[in-house]
Amino acid sequence: MQIQSHYKKGTLLFVLAIAVTLIAAIGTEPLYTDPYQLEYPDYFGNRISIPKNNPTTKQGVYLGRMLFYETKLSSNKRISCGSCHQQKLAFTDGKAFSPGINNVPTKRNSMSLANLLWVRNFFWDGRAKGLEEQAIIPINDPHEMGAYLDKAIKELQQTKVYPTLFRKAFGTAKITSDRIAKAIAQFERTLISANSSYDNYLKGKYTPSEEELNGMELFMNSAEASKNTRGASCAHCHGTPKMYMELFHNNGLDSIPKDRGREALTGLPNDKGRFRVVTLRNIALTAPYMHDGRFKNLEEVLNHYNEHIRPSKSLSLFLQGQSNESGGKNLGLTAKEKSNIISFLKMLTDTTFINNPAFSNPHLVRSK
């Protein structure tokens, strides 16, 4: 009996210790009980960006998805992150400039959110150093969502659904701007696009057409007339399987740019007109193009790089002296070559990405 009594007492103390530990953890730290499995091909590499204090969990991702499409996070209750980043358009919106609060247009074109897991500098000028920072900036921006976060948080706290979701994701029902940013960032890290015809080609499951193969070769090759090699020199900035490199370039849009680009952030003259290199995945879906949406279609983009590069002191070295013709003053691609390149670019469309129900608006599902 004495042994049994000590056993029960020891068990009770152990259970109490565990309970106290759990209560303490629940009160101060997120509960990371259900990890979200991020799936992507090996050729994307493992140089991913996930902060230690914001691991990706199923609970956090679902909460982030709800918040991504939550119009309560805008001052007029009509705009969400999903307004400017629509799934059917590979998380862009088809406009040169997005209409923000009171239909005031934003200053730059909405960027695709595909494959942000590998990105370290966000926005066209790279001003945000992480997805958590990126997620909150548009919400606070007076010209975008224009939210008064303290007021929005009170509204979310008074709903039936959000306190429960925050408790599941972070251990308590308390809603904060930091937790909002973390949850949205978790959701955005799941927006992986890796099931295009190009991906299937890399896996040996798709045979490109002659036009697509020719376009791929031109895309990857540099224009070197001296070596009798024809190319479009795209791979300098877009040559990885993810179709971008984490670089900033002045791509010759203007000799004197109206938008200073990265220079406004760094103050460096060499950054004038430089913008972040964007992914070309799903590029056929994300018109109009460039930071100001000046090009309506891919044909206009190819024409720009082929014959309309504007010189400036900060012009990318990759765009200087490139020509397929000996002594040529421009790239010198033929109409057929440009058409072939566009055929290749269309291989980068991932229809499963734009139709994945895990990325869709959950509020529409809940309202049915």
Task: Give short role names for the model-derived ranges.
Residues 155-176, 253-258, 262, 310-331:
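Amphipathic, soluble alpha/beta structural segments
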Residues 12, 21, 96, 102, ...:
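Compositionally biased, intrinsically disordered low-complexity regions
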Residues 2-61, 119, 137-140, 146-224, ...:
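Post-cleavage N-terminal segment of exported redox proteins
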Residues 29-137, 199-304, 309-317, 356-368:
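Short glycine/threonine-rich turn/loop motifs
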Residues 294-352:
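Extracellular low-complexity, Gly/Ser/Thr-rich intrinsically disordered linkers
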